UniProtKB/Swiss-Prot annotation:
Disulfide bonds, paired cysteine numbers: none
Organism: Anaplasma marginale (strain Florida)
NCBIfam families in the cross-refs: GTPase_YsxC
Gene: engB
This protein's UniProt keywords: Cell cycle, Cell division, GTP-binding, Magnesium, Metal-binding, Nucleotide-binding, Septation
Record bears the keyword GTP-binding: yes
Parts forming coiled coils: none
Designated name of the protein: Probable GTP-binding protein EngB
Binding of Mg(2+), residues: S36, T58
Family statement: Belongs to the TRAFAC class TrmE-Era-EngA-EngB-Septin-like GTPase superfamily. EngB GTPase family.
Pfam families: MMR_HSR1
Chain ranges of the EngB-type G domain: 21-196
Positions annotated to bind GTP: 29-36, 56-60, 74-77, 141-144, 172-177
Alphabetical list of Gene3D superfamilies matching this protein: P-loop containing nucleotide triphosphate hydrolases
Length: 205
């Protein structure tokens, strides 16, 4: 059902956020974690979200609308060390505003690069979400780069570090935009948001 998602808006200012009247699923994570590639894999559209090898290239909130039923939201990545403090503060302020005030936000998907695992900047973001009672799902990206045993080790390590997190929604899904692994499971989780809307629980507790 997500194959008809199309880019409809790129927003750099909180006052310009669109109102689609549909549930939104937002993708967050460190710079270069593979958000755009994963959105393209989920929507089966290789040219949908612009993919860049340069970290921090997404400086705006990008919206992809699926036939007026669901919107996927690509949030700017955090943790890019080469971004100026002023620039980083500007777009992270936009992300914070979106996460705290967006009534249409139904699910936040936090992406973790399986090759490097959870970093302190990820844990800081998770703590921020926990403190503000924002529900989120964890998705491991780029699992095609790992052997099966390596992936299991990474998954166990991640599960151990987030044990006790109250806002975390399960299951933790391993994905690969390149091989397609885990994409079907992720699409299933995302699609459930349409069925749950508007009677389902909001992303904020």
């Amino acid at each position: 059902m997500l194959s008809k998602c199309r880019f409809v808006a790129g927003v750099q200012d909180k006052h310009s956020l669109p109102d689609f009247q549909v549930p939104e699923v937002a993708f967050a994570g460190r710079s270069n974690v593979g958000k755009s590639s994963l959105i393209n894999a989920v929507t089966k559209n290789k040219k949908g979200a612009r993919v860049s090898s340069n970290p921090g290239s997404t400086r705006q909130i990008n919206f992809y609308l699926n036939e007026g039923a669901l919107a996927l939201v690509d949030l700017p990545g955090y943790g890019y060390s080469k971004a100026s403090k002023e620039s980083a503060s500007s777009y992270m302020s936009l992300v914070e505003h979106y996460l705290l005030t967006r009534e249409a936000l139904h699910r936040l998907v936090l992406l973790i690069d399986s090759k490097v695992g959870l970093k302190e900047v990820d844990m800081d973001f998770i703590s921020w979400l926990e403190e503000r009672c924002i529900h989120y799902s964890l998705v491991l990206t780029k699992i095609d780069r790992l052997a099966c045993t390596e992936f299991n080790d990474v998954l166990s390590a991640v599960q151990s570090r987030v044990k006790g997190c109250c806002m975390l929604l399960h299951p933790i899904i391993g994905t690969s935009s390149k091989s397609g692994k885990g994409i079907k499971e992720l699409v299933h989780e995302v699609s459930k948001c349409v069925k749950e809307w508007p009677g389902g629980r909001d992303v904020r507790a």
